[in-house]
C-alpha cells in the first residue's frame, strides 16, 4: 500500500503592513529548496474583494463574514485534496491568513452563530492548523516603515493598525503552536526569524526549542480569564513507554468539552541535538495509545492559560496539587533571547534547569 503524503498546514497572519507578502516569497524559495512541495492559499478577503464580493456590497457585515469563512474552509479542503494527490511526499500548505482571522470583524455572538451553522467548535476550528505565525505590524516597533501606499485596501492609521494587530493576535490565542514574529530586528532579520520558526515547526533537524520555566506565586485567575488575549485550555499529558530510544507522550487538549489529540516524540539527532516531532491523532488512535502508557508515570493534568504579551506567547499552568504557586513557561528558538515577564506575575525563581520541575519528572511515580 502506497504511503500517504506528509502534509503540513500553516498560517501566516499578522497586522497591517507586517511584511506577509514578502514573507510568502521567502517561504516559497526556502521551503522548495528544502525539498517541500509548497501550495499557497491566497488571502480570502483580498480574493473576494478583487472579485467584487465585498462587505460594503453585502446586506450586512455578518453576511459577508459568513461567505468569507465558508470560502476559506472550501479552499482549505480543495488544497488538502491537491496535497494528497501531489507526487511529492512532503507538502506544505501555507495559508495567507486562516479561519480565525475573521473573528475580529464580528461580534462574539456572530462568530458563535457561524460555528454553530458549520457544526464546528472553536477549539477544533482554531487548532486544525499545525502552526500559526503572527507577524507584528510595522506600526508597532518599526513605525518609520509603516505605509498604506503598497496596498490600496489598507487604510488604517498607526493607532488603528496596532489595535487590529492586537485583535488578530488575540483571536489566535490558545493555539498550541502560535509564534510571534516582532520587529526587534531589521526586516531581513524578521524574515530569517520567521523562516527559522517555520522550519522548526515542520520538524526539520534543528535545535530543540528552549523552554524557560519559572515558578510564580499563584496568579489572579480572574485577571487571566478576562484578559482579551488569553485563552484557557485543559490538558492531560500521558507518557508512553519508549520505542527505540524515543520518548513519547500523548496529549488531550481543549476546553468546554471539545478536545484535540497529539503525540509528541523526542529523539536525538546525529549531531547530538534534540529533535521534537508532533502529529495529530484521532480519538481512536489516542485511546489505543493509552494502552502503551508508561506504568511508572502518572498522567499530568493541568489547566493552562495561553497569554499573548508583546513578542512572546506565555503559558501559565495550574496543577491541582499546587495551592500557592503556578508554572510560567515561554518557548524560544534562541536561548539567549530576552524575556520580559508580564508585571502581573511575581516570580519565585527560574526552574528551567531544575530536573524536579520537568514534566517527565513530575509524572514519575515516587
Q: What is each model feature region?
A:
Residues 28-71:
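Conserved substrate/cofactor phosphate-moiety recognition/catalytic segment
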Residues 16:
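The conserved Walker
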Residues 20:
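Conserved lysine of the Walker
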Residues 105, 109-170:
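A glycine- and Lys/Arg-enriched "phosphate-lid" helix/loop adjacent to the NTP-binding pocket
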Residues 53-113:
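Conserved nucleotide-sensing/catalytic segment adjacent to the nucleotide-binding pocket
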Residues 23:
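Hydrophobic positions on the alpha1 helix immediately C-terminal to the Walker A/P-loop
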Residues 188-189, 195-366:
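Phosphate-end processing signature that detects enzymes handling 5′-triphosphorylated RNA
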Residues 2-4, 160, 166-218:
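NTP-dependent small-molecule kinase module
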Amino acid at each position: 500500500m502506497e504511503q500517504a503524503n506528509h502534509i503540513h498546514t500553516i498560517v501566516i497572519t499578522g497586522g497591517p503592513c507586517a511584511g506577509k507578502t514578502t514573507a510568502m516569497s521567502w517561504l516559497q524559495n526556502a521551503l522548495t529548496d528544502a525539498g517541500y512541495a509548497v501550495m499557497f492559499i491566497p488571502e480570502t478577503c483580498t480574493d473576494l474583494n478583487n472579485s467584487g464580493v465585498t462587505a460594503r456590497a453585502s446586506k450586512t457585515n455578518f453576511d459577508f463574514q459568513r461567505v468569507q469563512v465558508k470560502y476559506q474552509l472550501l479552499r482549505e479542503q480543495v488544497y488538502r485534496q491537491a496535497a494528497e494527490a501531489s507526487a511529492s511526499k512532503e507538502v506544505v500548505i501555507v495559508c495567507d491568513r486562516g479561519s480565525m482571522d475573521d473573528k475580529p470583524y464580528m461580534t462574539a455572538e456572530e462568530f458563535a452563530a457561524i460555528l454553530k451553522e458549520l457544526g464546528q467548535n472553536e477549539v477544533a476550528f482554531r487548532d486544525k492548523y499545525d502552526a500559526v505565525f503572527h507577524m507584528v505590524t510595522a506600526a508597532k516597533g518599526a513605525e518609520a516603515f509603516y505605509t498604506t501606499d503598497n496596498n490600496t485596501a489598507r487604510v488604517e492609521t498607526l493607532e488603528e493598525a496596532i489595535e487590529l494587530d492586537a485583535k488578530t493576535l488575540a483571536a489566535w490565542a490558545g493555539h498550541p503552536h502560535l509564534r510571534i514574529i516582532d520587529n526587534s530586528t531589521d526586516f531581513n532579520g524578521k524574515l530569517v526569524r520567521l523562516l527559522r520558526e517555520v522550519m522548526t515547526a515542520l520538524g526539520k533537524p534543528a535545535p530543540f526549542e528552549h523552554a524557560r520555566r519559572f515558578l510564580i506565586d499563584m496568579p489572579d485567575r480572574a485577571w487571566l480569564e478576562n484578559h482579551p488575549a488569553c485563552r484557557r485550555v485543559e490538558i492531560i499529558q500521558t507518557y508512553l513507554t519508549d520505542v527505540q530510544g524515543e520518548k513519547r507522550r500523548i496529549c488531550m487538549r481543549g476546553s468546554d468539552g471539545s478536545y484535540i489529540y497529539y503525540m509528541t516524540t523526542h529523539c536525538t539527532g546525529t549531531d547530538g541535538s534534540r529533535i521534537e516531532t508532533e502529529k495529530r491523532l484521532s480519538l481512536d488512535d489516542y485511546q489505543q495509545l493509552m494502552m502503551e502508557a508508561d506504568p511508572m508515570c502518572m498522567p499530568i493534568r493541568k489547566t493552562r492559560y495561553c497569554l499573548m504579551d508583546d513578542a512572546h506567547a506565555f503559558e501559565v499552568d495550574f496543577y491541582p496539587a499546587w495551592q500557592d504557586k503556578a508554572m510560567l513557561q515561554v518557548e524560544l528558538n534562541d536561548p539567549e533571547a530576552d524575556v520580559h515577564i508580564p508585571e502581573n506575575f511575581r516570580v519565585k525563581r527560574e526552574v528551567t534547569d531544575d530536573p524536579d520541575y520537568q514534566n517527565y519528572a513530575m509524572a514519575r511515580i515516587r
